[in-house]
Amino acid sequence: MLITKNQAEKWFDNSLGKQFNPDLFYGFQCYDYANMFFMIATGERLQGLYAYNIPFDNKARIEKYGQIIKNYDSFLPQKLDIVVFPSKYGGGAGHVEIVESANLNTFTSFGQNWNGKGWTNGVAQPGWGPETVTRHVHYYDDPMYFIRLNFPDKVSVGDKAKSVIKQATAKKQAVIKPKKIMLVAGHGYNDPGAVGNGTNERDFIRKYITPNIAKYLRHAGHEVALYGGSSQSQDMYQDTAYGVNVGNNKDYGLYWVKSHGYDIVLEIHLDAAGESASGGHVIISSQFNADTIDKSIQDVIKNNLGQIRGVTPRNDLLNVNVSAEININYRLSELGFITNKNDMDWIKKNYDLYSKLIAGAIHGKPIGGLVAGNVKTSAKNQKNPPVPAGYTLDKNNVPYKKETGYYTVANVKGNNVRDGYSTNSRITGVLPNNATIKYDGAYCINGYRWITYIANSGQRRYIATGEVDKAGNRISSFGKFSTI
């Protein structure tokens, strides 16, 4: 750590009303503010595309200097904790702020771009908007993560000298450099690709997807070309195959793209199978490891339409193999199934948002920024939640078990009592440490095991009694259970 807690608090207190843009793109975004704080404190920068992924994209880096805490019912944040909001904020990008104070019901924090006014003037680099760092009061959400840095009591002269170098390096690394990017619509010429739901792969991608991705990337300052020119009249697969057949590894298809110095290549397709097959994924050469762009595009697919599988290495596709042969930064993305009605209904309705998010994945930051208070466009329905042994789905599709017993709080801060089985539900009171209640049912949802009971008021109430994993297995407990 390069500053003490007192120094960090002074910087934080003085940040109110100011603006921060360390990467010099799209004005004053929420991620910029958290990144500036992290750079000043540690000399390193947070990396990644979306705010909600900060704890996961930067896990090893953060844990060198502090800890990542997933919010739980009786957790109390501290001043200077970095709070990471889930993906339903910021149009799917999430949001991040820094805590000023907290109680068990709400917390107060400082942040940029909560109202989407951190970038308004239309200039990508560096961009400008009137919204400054402002104070907000928030309820807790689920999932919500807090990053707590371990500040020292004092910093040595040597560490101070290192801080100047590390902060300068971090700021330099934060700047996003323009790239030369080639976007390739799959199929072409006399090959329409897959057909389904009133359209074909070749025409749909050329009309709705590649031009919009190009629009947003150009807005971000990148040099972008569409394969085959503005009409996208060529098929890169057929062109590459011709180059292979005639032994010309310079003038056709992906060889031509390489010879013209493109830094990044994205080829876009729609998948096809039975009507029930759903979701997208990214394909790369088995000779490469997935890079940040591959993972970020995969995240866009997963968090919006849904994924059928993760980033997939292959060695049986022509352009994939040629990309390894000539060492070019290439991936093929299947954005969803043209043969699945739900997939195509979602893509047709949200093609501009989808394109913008994919462009942001390539750019390395959400393009144009997003209003934190807006909930993202709804994804299509997902599969039923996992049902642990002994539970059944109730009428609301929530795993429930008829169970009676006693629960005794074993947490000095007590357990929040709510009017529903979600950390978004209203807190109606706090069950103090060592208090015991008789319960008559249990739920497993939203990352917690909940119990329910009738309070003295005659109203049904709910308590989160511990965390569970994705399969519903208990991994922590806030109290003790006993049978009746």
UniProtKB/Swiss-Prot annotation:
Reaction equations catalysed: Hydrolyzes the link between N-acetylmuramoyl residues and L-amino acid residues in certain cell-wall glycopeptides
Known role: Has weak lytic activity toward S.aureus cells. Full-length protein has no activity, but fusion of the Peptidase C51 domain to the lysostaphin SH3 cell wall binding domain yields an active chimeric enzyme, suggesting that PH may be functional.
GO MF entries: N-acetylmuramoyl-L-alanine amidase activity
Limits of the Peptidase C51 domain: 5-148
All residue ranges annotated as the MurNAc-LAA domain in the record: 181-363
Protein name, as recorded: Probable autolysin PH
Enzyme Commission number(s): 3.5.1.28
Origin species: Staphylococcus aureus (strain NCTC 8325 / PS 47)
GO terms of biological process kind: cell wall organization; defense response to bacterium; FtsZ-dependent cytokinesis; killing of cells of another organism; peptidoglycan catabolic process
Domain SH3b: 402-472
Keyword Hydrolase attached: yes
Keywords of the record: Antimicrobial, Bacteriolytic enzyme, Cell wall biogenesis/degradation, Hydrolase
A cellular-component GO term for this protein: outer membrane-bounded periplasmic space
